[in-house]
């Protein structure tokens, strides 16, 4: 990591990275099967990479961005499933807290969560989550003021077209694709999470070790319930483009 290094731009799947159509690529390097694109986004130098799905891939790629490429910060751009029933497909969540919901100890038929790296045993810290720095949060809020992030068509709502809303909140990370309304309700109730994905908290664990700022931006492609396996492919491209608009603006202040 270098204070004057480029931004690291991460995505999990091709559609999430392709949504950044203003990305100018100058050269490429392949490491560990991942293609790192060196170039610019707007006025900022950056290294962009499609890291793959899940926590292990995300942690590996984040480490390479910070150690091999000297990135000063990481932006994660992508889609997620919604947990908060008040949110809709196309809404955007900027994570001000990232929680790994599937790490911990199985006790009495339930998972008791612990922070990754902490032994999941009695007597050890039970504090969980990675919080967005408050001063960076305010910079992001100011930068996003007045930004038109678009929306999704009537097919996403079953009625009228929906103008995307931008929300700061808790995002949950785990190695599952959630297609279960009951579990969605439990996770929302237990953790206060408003969106769920498969990489963010793993990247946060790495970023914390390096002392690097991280901002995770997720547009909702589905609502993590019984229809998510159909909604995800249907609204993936539109949601990825919405997230990319937000990330482009945040790149000016991180």
Residue ranges and their predicted role:
Residues 23, 135-150, 206, 245-253:
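Generic non-transmembrane alpha-helical segments
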Residues 71-74:
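Proline-aspartate-enriched helix->loop->beta-strand connector
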């Amino acid at each position: 990591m270098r204070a004057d290094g480029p931004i690291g731009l991460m995505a999990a799947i091709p559609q999430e990275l392709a949504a950044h159509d203003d990305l100018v690529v100058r050269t490429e390097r392949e490491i560990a099967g991942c293609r790192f694109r060196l170039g610019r986004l707007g006025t900022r130098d950056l290294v962009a990479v499609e890291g793959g799905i899940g926590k292990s891939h995300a942690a590996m790629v984040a480490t390479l961005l910070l150690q091999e490429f000297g990135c000063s910060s990481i932006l994660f751009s992508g889609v997620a499933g919604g947990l908060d029933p008040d949110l809709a497909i196309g809404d955007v969540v900027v994570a001000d807290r990232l929680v790994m919901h599937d790490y911990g100890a199985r006790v009495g038929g339930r998972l008791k969560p612990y922070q990754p790296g902490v032994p999941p045993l009695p007597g050890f810290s039970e504090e969980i989550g990675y919080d967005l720095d408050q001063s960076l949060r305010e910079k992001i809020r100011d930068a996003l003021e007045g930004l038109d992030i678009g929306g999704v068509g009537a097919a996403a709502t079953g009625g009228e077209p929906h103008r995307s809303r931008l929300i700061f909140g808790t995002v949950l990370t785990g190695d599952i694709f959630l297609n279960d309304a009951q579990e969605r309700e439990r996770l929302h109730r237990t953790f206060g999470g408003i969106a769920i994905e498969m990489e963010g908290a793993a990247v946060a664990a790495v970023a914390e070790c390096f002392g690097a700022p991280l901002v995770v931006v997720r547009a909702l492609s589905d609502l993590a319930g019984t229809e998510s396996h159909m909604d995800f492919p249907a609204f993936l491209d539109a949601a990825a483009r919405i997230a990319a608009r937000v990330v482009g603006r945040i790149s000016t202040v991180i």
